[in-house]
Design a protein with these regions (language model features):
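N-terminal intrinsically disordered, cationic/polar leader segments
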Residues: 2-31, 35-47, 73
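Glycine-rich phosphate-binding loop signature in dinucleotide/nucleotide-binding domains
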Residues: 54-58, 82
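Acidic beta-strand-to-loop metal/phosphate-binding motif
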Residues: 59-65
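Short Gly/Thr/Asp-enriched flexible loops that form oxyanion-binding sites at enzyme active sites
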Residues: 71-81
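Short, acidic/small-residue loops that bind anionic groups at enzyme active sites
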Residues: 81-99, 112
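Short, glycine-/small-residue-rich phosphate/pyrophosphate-handling segment
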Residues: 102-129
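Conserved small/polar residues in nucleotide/adenosyl-binding loops
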Residues: 133-135
Length: 135
């Protein structure tokens, strides 16, 4: 099974993991990695190592919040040193829920990367409201 690590600035990752459990049910091997203002890249690398230790798996998917942000940069360094990890940025709730659903069906790392990319983008919708009809 692919372990999923959700990494974000502040405590967003914890909120995403908790919210996904409301929708998809509690999941094994889903870890939130937080990043506080007092922390640096080495702290994040240590947190990724701890997440892997806490959720031993064949493969790891790290879903980071922002391309170029510290959680992503550290995740990219972490994954580059391994053969069993990939990183996708722009994590949102639709992305996480879809990834967990596909994982429950036995999806491998490559499949989950594709699902994450597609679901993350498709989860963003714009609903135009006819403001003239709104009172």
């Amino acid at each position: 099974m692919v372990a999923v690590i959700v990494a974000a600035h502040g405590h967003l990752a914890e909120g995403l993991v908790a919210s996904s459990a409301m929708i998809a049910g509690p999941q094994d091997d889903v870890v939130a990695v937080t990043f506080d203002p007092s922390e640096g890249p080495d702290d994040l690398l240590a947190k990724y190592a701890a997440a892997v230790e806490a959720s031993p798996s064949d493969q790891y998917l790290i879903l980071a919040d922002l391309f170029g942000g510290s959680p992503y940069n550290a995740a990219a360094r972490f994954a580059a040193a391994r053969d069993d990890a990939d990183v996708v940025t722009g994590v949102n709730l639709p992305m996480l829920v879809e990834v967990l659903g596909r994982r429950m069906l036995g999806g491998n790392l490559a499949e989950l990367v594709e699902v994450a990319s597609t679901a993350g983008a498709n989860g963003v919708k714009v609903k135009f409201v006819d403001r003239k009809s709104v009172v």
